[in-house]
A protein has these predicted regions:
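Globin-like tetrapyrrole-binding proteins
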Residues: 1-161
């Protein structure tokens, strides 16, 4: 693993350990943040959850955490894992890229809320990861069979960083 990836991985581990210590299970606060920004996504979880909405929601929160960790350790692997998933979610399940990115943003909002003021290195790394992932999501939009409407993907609110 290149030195930069090791550094990012170490910062991510530090952030995730603190997140677990401070929050424990982050599912509820992540979903609160997610549905606040994407209220229309709630019905999609009900529809796709097939009676197991809470289980699906929990799995998507965990998937977003794992995506962020993987992105810091091996961006190529994360791109392979999520490249087809993002297109599939849009084209087959009608889950637009705003919602996909929104779940990652909700996880980051909760995670960033646990960082101490002096953790600029972690904060900067997560800003960079979010920016990289948003560019990746944007790059996949040209592969969509079903248009998502083309509205720009949102920037991560500075106030939440």
């Amino acid at each position: 693993m290149p030195a930069e990836a090791r550094d990012r991985s170490a910062l991510a581990q530090k952030s995730f350990e603190r997140l677990a210590e401070v929050c424990g299970d982050i599912t509820a606060p992540v979903l609160e943040a997610y549905y606040r920004e994407h209220p229309g996504a709630r019905q999609s979880f009900v529809d796709h959850g097939l009676g197991e909405t809470a289980k699906l929601e929990g799995r998507m929160v965990a998937e977003s955490l794992f995506l962020l960790l993987t992105w810091t350790e091996n961006q190529s692997a994360a791109r392979i894992d999520h490249g087809s998933a993002i297109v599939h979610h849009n084209d087959t399940m009608r889950i637009p890229p705003h919602w996909y990115l929104g779940m990652v943003d909700a996880v980051l909002e909760v995670l960033l809320g646990t960082l101490p003021a002096e953790a600029d290195d972690e904060r900067d790394m997560w800003r960079e990861v979010r920016s990289e992932f948003a560019r990746f999501v944007q790059s996949l939009r040209e592969e969509f069979v079903r248009s998502d409407g083309g509205a720009p993907l949102p920037a991560f609110p500075v106030a939440k960083m």
